[in-house]
Amino acid sequence: MENVLRNDWGPLLAPEFEKEYYLTLSSFLTEEYSTHVVYPKVEDIFNALQYTSYENTKVVILGQDPYHGPNQAHGLSFSVQPGVKTPPSLLNMYKELRDEYGYEIPNNGYLVKWAEQGVLLLNTVLTVRQSEANSHKGKGWEHFTDRVIQLLNEREKPVIFILWGRHAQAKKKLITNPNHHIIESVHPSPLSARRGFFGSKPYSKVNTILANMGEREIDWEIPNL
């Protein structure tokens, strides 16, 4: 579980891979991957950071832990691999997108197009045991992903943080730089979406901020596969 980051995140996060918590986490993961089915695949664990470099991050959408069903997780929060049914929270995200922009709901949940435009799709925990939600919670990933958020907080260039639900909003304490923007609402989960996610217009809010900064707006439309 050494530093495999191939872009500017590599040197920024290099110290984390030497820290006690990470060495303990790495030993735990070696054991977990050899004795259980764990998602995502080892080579996909850091995909959020691989697809969206530090310098290119415009938006952060914070998730919790990876999907724990077969062939779903591939290292990007909320996203699933091609050929897999779109999960309920992501379907609600698409419904809000349809209401904001009129986009048709796509036939897939593969969000790489967002990541490639500077949307960091970051879970706070990067691995999970099959069928056991939160099974890798408290094992060390939170220290690592907190550091990712702190590094973005240190940046002069503004970042837009999208915090949906209490779990994501708990990270607000790490975002202290007044340059940055926070967009928050309840989670898009079917349990809460009708209590303030629907109608919150997060996608157009992001693009309004980017346009005001003179930055290229995000094309949120996910193509059919």
Swiss-Prot record:
Cellular compartments annotated: Cytoplasm
Pfam families: UDG
Coiled coil: none
Catalysed reactions, semicolon-separated: Hydrolyzes single-stranded DNA or mismatched double-stranded DNA and polynucleotides, releasing free uracil
Broadest EC class assigned to this enzyme: hydrolase
Active site (UniProt): D65 (proton acceptor)
GO biological process, one term: base-excision repair, AP site formation via deaminated base removal
Keywords of the record: Cytoplasm, DNA damage, DNA repair, Hydrolase
GO cellular component: cytoplasm
Gene3D superfamilies, A to Z: Uracil-DNA glycosylase-like domain (3.40.470.10)
InterPro entries noted in UniProt: UDG_fam1 (IPR002043), Ura-DNA_Glyclase_AS (IPR018085), Uracil-DNA_glycosylase-like (IPR005122), Uracil-DNA_glycosylase-like_sf (IPR036895)
E.C. code: 3.2.2.27
SMART domains xrefs: UDG (SM00986), UreE_C (SM00987)
Molecular function terms from GO: uracil DNA N-glycosylase activity
Similarity remark: Belongs to the uracil-DNA glycosylase (UDG) superfamily. UNG family.
NCBIfam families per UniProt: PRK05254.1-1, PRK05254.1-2, PRK05254.1-4, PRK05254.1-5, ung
Functional description taken from the UniProt entry: Excises uracil residues from the DNA which can arise as a result of misincorporation of dUMP residues by DNA polymerase or due to deamination of cytosine.
Name of the protein this chain belongs to: Uracil-DNA glycosylase
Lineage of the species this protein comes from: Bacteria, Bacillati, Bacillota, Bacilli, Bacillales
